[in-house]
């Protein structure tokens, strides 16, 4: 599994899930990000996350395919 560390911008408390998937480059577009979330392919802290705009915060771990994204 490929580990990616994502640091929230200073002053930001969260990033929407679909924005995170685009920002780290594991999906090609926002519509693709929405599709993989809606299909139940993304896990947040070990649980399937179906909310496209879920607020991802520091300490969360997102998993999709062979990627593990740790939020700082």
Per-range role (PLM):
Residues 2-15:
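A detector for short, charged/polar N-terminal pre-domain segments
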Residues 68-72:
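Short, Lys/Arg- and Gly-enriched loop/turn segments at beta-strand edges
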Residues 15-55:
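A basic, amphipathic helix-loop patch mediating RNA/tRNA/ribosome contacts
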């Amino acid at each position: 599994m490929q580990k990616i560390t994502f640091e929230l911008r200073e002053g930001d408390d969260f990033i929407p899930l679909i924005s995170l998937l685009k920002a780290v480059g594991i999906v090609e577009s926002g519509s693709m990000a929405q599709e993989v979330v809606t299909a139940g392919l993304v896990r947040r802290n070990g649980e399937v996350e179906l909310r496209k705009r879920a607020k991802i915060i520091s300490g969360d771990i997102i998993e999709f395919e062979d990627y593990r994204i740790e939020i700082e």
